[in-house]
Amino acid sequence: FAGDVYEAMAINKVEDDVLPNFLDFAQKNIRILSGLYGILKPLDLIQPYRLEMSTNFTNSKIFKNHQLSQNFSNLYSFWNDKITDVLNFEIINHKDKTIVNLASEEYFRAINLKKINANIVNVVFKEQKNNQMKIIGISAKKARGLMARFIIDSKINHHKEITNFQANGYCFNRDLSDNNNYVFVRN
């Protein structure tokens, strides 16, 4: 993958001596939501593609030759239960039954929250702009990549440990946060 989130993770800058442990932890703990593949582990091989999760295909011929038991109008309806089932299966082996959500709202909507067997902690990155706290898209994307890198480097195994994240001017804001939404602010 390329883009602001992945560039901020700076995988190519991981020192050779720690790379095997870095990749092992990432492979066991990081999941990537994909419009084409559904859910991926960091080392899964993929073909280059451009397909957004929000792509609609009402009356499309995409699935015409496939034997599907139901019609899907978009990628959310296609992936919803499949992604949720994988996450439910994988969370069984984790002591902290919490998913730290670093996905964009667009991609996170692909998870069926009514069927997920885990706590969800949404990570939100905000900045002070015109005397208001706002999410600035490009900055939030980079911050999500930095947070993913922090989780891997620090080998985070409990969601509360992410409150120690400090990068690119962001730090945890307890006053704006609650049990399900961790807000990181940069002034």
Functional labels for PLM-detected ranges:
Residues 14-178, 183-187:
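Internal, well-folded beta-alpha domain core
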Residues 1-15, 22:
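Active-site helix-to-loop segments that bind/position phosphate- or nucleotide-bearing substrates
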